Amino acid sequence: MSKCGRKKYMKTNLRQMTMETIDSQQDGSLPDSVAESESAHMQTQTGQNSIPTLAQVSVAGSSTGRGSPAVTLVQLPSGQTVHVQGVIQTPQPSVIQSPQIQTVQVATIAETDESAESEGVIDSHKRREILSRRPSYRKILNELSSDVPGVPKIEEEKSEEEGTPPNIAAMAVPTSIYQTSTGQYIAIAQGGTIQISNPGSDGVQGLQALTMTNSGAPPPGATIVQYAAQSADGTQQFFVPGSQVVVQDEETELAPSHMAAATGDMPTYQIRAPTTALPQGVVMAASPGSLHSPQQLAEEATRKRELRLMKNREAAKECRRRKKEYVKCLESRVAVLEVQNKKLIEELETLKDICSPKTD
């Protein structure tokens, strides 16, 4: 075998030996010591600069610890022992320690549809409770009128669950029923019929119909209502929906007097002395809103038109007067300027006469 072939063979065997040693240490099968047979071909340096023989010897490989470089003990044929260190070294553990990073996880809890629905239901219940606690206008009116004498109280309208009052029968009657201070019930139907019932009567069955008649000399648009029942003292107070009404009969006269807390559509009526004589049991109710007949409406429109025209005429007259005053002022100013102009012309002629002889 030539020298080149020997060198290549030795290098190849040395690489294989070193790789096997490193693999055995990395696997960790022998943590304390590793004993194995390895074949090593060493080249001894002599004065002739050549490799005399190729020896195969048994060596003992030891490792000081895991991760340290592998050191192989090689015994030559001449009896000399050589320590051979592996070329490939395992990576050393880093001395620098990485800082410990504390990981914090933030979890967001989203509201589900059920929670949103439950909140909506709670809000609706609260709103209903607030609305149910609000007193009705009738309750407020009764509280305000409790200290005022002669003002009747209106019964609260009970809900459907509580049922109808015991003294009013449950029947479909398209009327508005009111209770007076004397206990009587006044029902006003849609057609304009007014009915009165006594306190002892059972519901609306005891209502008395009031006949609608016309008087000989009532005011235009007035309504004549006949009733049959009055209180013991001759006074009666009741509420009637609508505008202000004047009521008269043979003995008494009813005039509207609004309370401070009244809503405007529920005027109170008080009794006064009569001014005219009407048939017995007949009252005259005249509403100012019903007095506007077509003729009166036309007269009102004509009156407004005449008033507007009169204001326009007065404004035009004032405008003409101011224009005349302005023209007179301008005329007087022109007259003054003309007089001044004449004086200046005369002075100019005089100056010319004075200057002309000197030039000659």
Swiss-Prot record:
Segments for region (Leucine-zipper): 330-351
Top-rank taxon, per record: Eukaryota
Residues modified as Phosphoserine: 118, 145, 287, 290, 293
Annotated KID domain residues: 104-163
PTM (free text): Stimulated by phosphorylation. Phosphorylated on Ser-118 by TSSK4 in vitro.
Gene Ontology molecular function, alphabetical: DNA-binding transcription factor activity, RNA polymerase II-specific; RNA polymerase II cis-regulatory region sequence-specific DNA binding
Compartments, as annotated in UniProt: Nucleus
Main location class: nucleus
Extent of Polar residues compositional bias: 19-28, 40-52
Region (Basic motif): 303-328
Entry keyword set: Activator, DNA-binding, Nucleus, Phosphoprotein, Repressor, Transcription, Transcription regulation
Example GO biological process: regulation of transcription by RNA polymerase II
GO CC, alphabetical: ATF4-CREB1 transcription factor complex
Residue span of region Disordered: 19-52
Classification via Gene3D superfamilies: 1.20.5.170
Function: Transcriptional regulator that binds the cAMP response element (CRE), a sequence present in many viral and cellular promoters. Isoforms are either transcriptional activators or repressors. Isoform 1 and isoform 2 are transcriptional activators. Plays a role in spermatogenesis and is involved in spermatid maturation.
Description of how the protein assembles with itself and partners: Binds DNA as a dimer. Interacts with FHL5. Interacts with CDC34. May interact with TSSK4.
Family affiliation: Belongs to the bZIP family.
Protein name, UniProt field: cAMP-responsive element modulator
Gene from which the chain derives: CREM
